[in-house]
């Protein structure tokens, strides 16, 4: 009987998020044009350690998403771990699940703690799309004559479907056609995303989640403390922008997520561990689900992941206070709103990637962090974050504010 009670208590022990921070998001070739993904991640990793005053040697595992690893050096997550002062005995895993990488890292950490293979996990994501290199695939054999092929690592490994070589935006166009989303529909969604992010910036709603980054300039240093992209956007020009992927299409740069740089980190542990340390959890992880389908329909994979999560937890849209669904394209989030009947007033309330930017290895962790602080600011309790990814998949996580 005692053994049964012990097993039940172990199985029911909740996993909690005790610290969460992100960098500001930098525009492509913007404020972080000379800052590597490892450097960005190190800043927020040190920040979350300081947030709860934990000894970094006590962290068992560092799990960090990163998609564009070429040129970063061996084992980027391990580099962050060592640079952030974690023990040499701390394990490190670099996760590549394309745009879901940052969230998948957290889910791996969650499951490791539940399995008893780790007590405290640092998880998150990082990306410098600006510093992703060009690749010369035939250089090893030698370019003997004529012009040689040079491949954009960012496009080829981050933004391009390997099965037919179409860019992700091609499939956004197909999604818009399927759902009947007009150019105006998508423009209005994107404009609202920008306006929401600007309001959040001006009212200080991002302040608690952002860790400023000090960058070197030619003559001095400067501190970056807010997302770069929203203030650069000229809303008046959005309706006249050219289609980005099809000359007769409806998807533009404005209704697509911006190429960006940034990082996000969280610390998770069991509720018992947090209590023993006197730490107040930011959020409880209630569950997570994955959904996979045809690669060309990654745009609607969030719908399946969220629906599965609703059913797993016996939740529904009326029981969830806020949603964060990554705005890879406006139509991705609009499709989820349509099929799941989610009110836009409870979705991406501080704007999304169409306004803020989408550093692909970090964004999924970023939306979870934004969700946590948005729930707290609005006195909400339950939230779901979901991110789709190339290959036709999506992951979703449910949290509850204690």
Label every model-predicted segment.
Residues 97-127, 176-205, 265-272, 337, ...:
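Active-site-proximal alpha-helical scaffold in enzymes
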Residues 10-35, 47, 150, 235-300, ...:
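Condensing-enzyme catalytic core mediating Claisen C-C bond formation in acyl metabolism
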Residues 11-72, 76-84, 91, 171-183, ...:
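Conserved active-site "lid/cap" helical segment
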Residues 22-23, 34, 38-43, 51, ...:
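N-terminal extracellular/periplasmic Venus flytrap/periplasmic-binding protein-like
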Residues 171-173, 209, 216, 286-355:
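Active-site pocket-lining segment
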Residues 66-120, 162-167, 232-258, 339-371, ...:
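Conserved catalytic cysteine-centered active-site region
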Residues 120-175:
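Flexible glycine-/small-residue-enriched beta->alpha junction loops
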């Amino acid at each position: 009987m005692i053994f049964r009670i012990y097993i039940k208590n172990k199985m029911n022990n909740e996993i909690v998020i005790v610290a969460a921070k992100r960098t500001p998001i930098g525009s492509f070739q913007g404020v972080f044009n000379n800052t590597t993904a490892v450097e960005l991640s190190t800043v927020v990793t040190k920040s979350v350690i300081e947030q709860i005053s934990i000894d970094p040697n006590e962290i068992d595992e560092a799990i960090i998403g990163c998609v564009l690893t070429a040129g970063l050096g061996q084992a980027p997550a391990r580099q962050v771990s060592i640079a952030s002062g974690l023990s040499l005995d701390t394990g490190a895993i670099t996760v590549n699940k394309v745009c879901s990488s940052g969230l998948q890292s957290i889910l791996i950490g969650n499951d490791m703690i539940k399995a008893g293979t780790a007590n405290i996990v640092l998880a998150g994501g990082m990306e410098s799309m600006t510093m992703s290199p060009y690749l010369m695939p035939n250089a090893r054999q030698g370019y003997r004559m004529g012009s040689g092929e040079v491949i954009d690592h960012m496009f080829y490994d981050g933004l391009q479907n390997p099965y037919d070589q179409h860019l992700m935006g091609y499939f956004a166009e197909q999604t818009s056609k399927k759902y009947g989303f007009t150019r105006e529909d998508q423009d209005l969604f994107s404009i609202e995303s920008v306006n929401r992010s600007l309001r959040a910036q001006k009212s200080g709603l991002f302040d608690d989640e952002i860790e400023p980054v000090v960058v070197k300039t030619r003559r001095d240093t400067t501190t970056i403390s807010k997302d770069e992209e929203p203030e650069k956007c000229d809303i008046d020009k959005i309706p006249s922008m050219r289609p980005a992927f099809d000359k007769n299409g409806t998807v533009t740069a404005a209704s697509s997520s911006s190429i960006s740089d940034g990082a996000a980190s969280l610390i998770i542990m069991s509720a018992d561990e947090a209590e023993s340390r006197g730490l107040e959890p930011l959020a409880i992880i209630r569950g997570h689900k994955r959904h996979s389908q045809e690669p060309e329909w990654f745009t609607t994979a969030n719908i399946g992941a969220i629906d599965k999560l609703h059913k797993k937890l016996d939740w529904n849209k009326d029981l969830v206070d806020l949603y964060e669904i990554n705005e890879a394209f406006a139509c991705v989030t609009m499709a989820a709103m349509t099929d799941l009947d989610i009110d836009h007033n409870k979705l991406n309330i501080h704007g999304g990637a169409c306004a803020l930017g989408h550093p692909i290895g970090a964004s999924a962790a970023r939306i979870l962090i934004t969700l946590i602080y948005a729930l707290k600011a609005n006195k909400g309790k339950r939230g779901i974050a979901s991110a789709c990814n190339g290959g036709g998949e999506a992951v979703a996580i449910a949290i509850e504010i204690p």
